[in-house]
Amino acid sequence: MERRKTLEYVTNQKQVERQILELVKTYNVLYKKQIYAFFAVDGKEKFVGKALHALLKERLIYMNEITKTVSQHEEAYQFREKGTLKAFWVLLSLMEQKKIERHFLAEKEEYPVRIVFVGDAEIYDILYISEAEIQLVNQLFSRQNPDGCGHIVIVEKPEEIPQIEIPNVIGFCTVQEEEGGIDYYRREERKRRNTKAKRTIGCRAENSRTCRSYACGSP
């Protein structure tokens, strides 16, 4: 019995190592907190510490103790992308609420999309739009044919939401990049031009990423 438990532990440990390596290769740079949160969804966070240590020892990853980030190599941090880090927090939030079958980093050509994921055989994406990019993004989407993909849009401030004019948005949110706190919002039906964003989740807790609600219903 004891041997079986040991073998099971080692198997889980190796599996977590492989998954961490895959995550880092996919998203380039992640906060260590994000990696722990990713495995906490399946109750495997207890394997993360030793897995990171093993990967560091083999020089398969690099960990910056100042920024608390994990990447493939030391130079990678300077190429970190704020929108992707925020989008990964949103992905983690959704993973706590529903089954995410697949997820991957969007191509540069898919700007402003950062992460694409599949849930219940439906495709969704997570966008990051800074205040300076709103007009450009509106123009880009005005030239595209709607693809039916549901969009979750990250903004810097909720006051920016009424300015965003893209189809198939199922929810808006603001995200704290390093801590992962998330506030979700939805936009009321456009009966007037001065549509306001309606806050749907009161997430001011220390870890608001774990709130069990979604702005416009689960995607």
Model-derived segments and spans:
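Nuclease-adjacent, charged terminal/linker segments that flank catalytic cores
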Residues: 1-79
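Hydrophobic transmembrane signal anchors and adjacent membrane-proximal interface regions, especially
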Residues: 4-5, 22, 35-37, 102, ...
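Nucleic-acid-binding surface
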Residues: 20-26, 33-34, 60-141
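Catalytic cores of nucleic-acid endonucleases
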Residues: 128-182
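Domain-level recognition of nuclease-like catalytic cores that cleave nucleotide substrates
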Residues: 159-217
